[in-house]
Regions:
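A structural signal for multi-pass alpha-helical bundles of membrane permease subunits
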Residues: 2-291
C-alpha cells in the first residue's frame, strides 16, 4: 500500500488540478464551440443551427473591421516590440553602469495592467490634457496631436501604448539569451577582426532563433486577446475604428445579447491563437526529443 502510494503520489497530488483545469478550461471551450453552432440569444439554446452564426459573423462589417484592426495592430506591435527589445537588450549587454536601474525602468511597464497603461496613455494623448496641450502652452499654438480622436490614427495610439508596455519584456528575453552565449565565441570573433555590429548581426542574433520564436508567440497571443487596453484607451472608438475581436465578442454577448454569435467570434479567436501556439509546441517537443 505504502509503495503504491509513494509511486503514485505525484499523480494523486496533480489529479485535482488537472481535473479542475480540464473542466473549467477545456470543458468550457467545448461548450463554447457547441453554443457557436446554435441560435442562442440571451440564454443558451441547445438545438443545432449549423454554421449560421459563422456566416453571420463574417457578413458583419463590424467584425471585418475588427479583424483588419487586429492585423494592423499585431503587425506593428510585433515589429516595434521586437526591434526595440533587441536594441535595449544589446545596449544593456554592454555591461554599462546602472544596468540594474535601467533594467528595472525598462521592465516596470510590464508590471502594470493594461487597464492602468491604457488610462495613463489616454491622459497623455488626450488633446485637451496631454501632449497637444503641453506644446500649445509652450507657445506652439498650431501644434496638433489628435490621434486619439482621429478615426484614421486612433489604432496607432493602441500600438504606442502596447509597445510601451511589452517592449521591456522582449528586452528581458533577449538579454537573457545574449548572456547565455559563451564568452569564448565573442572573443574569437573579435580576434578575427569582427566589429561589434558584425558580432551581434552575424553571430549572436542568429543564435537567438528560439528567443525570436518565443517572443513572436507571446506577443501574438497578447495582441489577439487585447481587450482591457482598448477599453481603457479608446473603448473601440472613435466609432468602431479601434474595435478588435475581443471587444467585439464581449459587446456582442453582453450588450446585444447574442450569445451564439459571440461564441462564434470566440472560437475564431481560439483558432487564431491555436494556429500560433501549436507550431511552437511542436517545435519545442521536437527539440526536446532531439536531445
Amino acid at each position: 500500500m505504502f509503495k503504491w502510494l509513494e509511486k503514485n503520489l505525484p499523480k494523486i497530488v496533480m489529479a485535482p488540478a488537472v481535473g479542475l483545469i480540464g473542466w473549467f478550461v477545456y470543458g468550457f471551450v467545448l461548450w463554447t464551440l457547441y453554443i457557436s453552432f446554435t441560435n442562442s440569444k440571451i440564454l443558451p439554446k441547445y438545438e443545432l443551427w449549423g454554421f449560421g452564426q459563422y456566416e453571420k459573423l463574417w457578413a458583419s462589417r463590424k467584425w471585418l473591421i475588427s479583424v483588419d484592426n487586429l492585423l494592423i495592430f499585431t503587425a506593428l506591435f510585433l515589429v516595434f516590440c521586437i526591434v526595440i527589445g533587441i536594441i535595449l537588450a544589446i545596449f544593456l549587454d554592454q555591461k554599462i553602469r546602472s544596468e540594474g536601474l535601467l533594467r528595472t525602468i525598462y521592465l516596470y511597464p510590464m508590471a502594470l495592467s493594461f487597464i492602468v497603461t491604457g488610462t495613463a496613455w489616454k491622459w497623455i494623448l488626450n488633446p485637451t490634457l496631454g501632449i497637444q496641450k503641453m506644446f500649445i502652452d509652450w507657445g506652439f499654438e498650431n501644434f496638433t496631436f489628435d490621434w486619439l480622436v482621429n478615426r484614421e490614427m486612433a489604432i496607432y495610439t493602441i500600438v504606442i501604448a502596447g509597445v510601451w508596455q511589452s517592449a521591456g519584456f522582449v528586452m528581458a528575453l533577449f538579454l537573457a539569451g545574449l548572456r547565455s552565449v559563451e564568452d569564448e565565441i565573442v572573443k574569437a570573433a573579435k580576434i578575427d577582426g569582427a566589429g561589434i555590429f558584425t558580432v551581434y548581426w552575424k553571430i549572436l542574433l542568429p543564435m537567438m532563433r528560439p528567443v525570436f520564436f518565443t517572443s513572436f508567440v507571446i506577443l501574438v497571443h497578447i495582441s489577439i486577446k487585447s481587450y482591457d487596453l482598448i477599453v481603457a484607451l479608446t473603448q473601440g472608438g472613435p466609432g468602431i475604428s479601434t474595435t478588435m475581436p475581443a471587444l467585439y465578442m464581449t459587446q456582442t454577448a453582453f450588450h446585444k445579447s447574442q450569445v451564439g454569435l459571440s461564441a462564434a467570434s470566440a472560437m475564431m479567436m481560439f483558432m487564431a491563437v491555436a494556429a500560433v501556439i501549436i507550431p511552437y509546441l511542436y517545435s519545442e517537443l521536437r527539440r526536446e526529443n532531439a536531445r
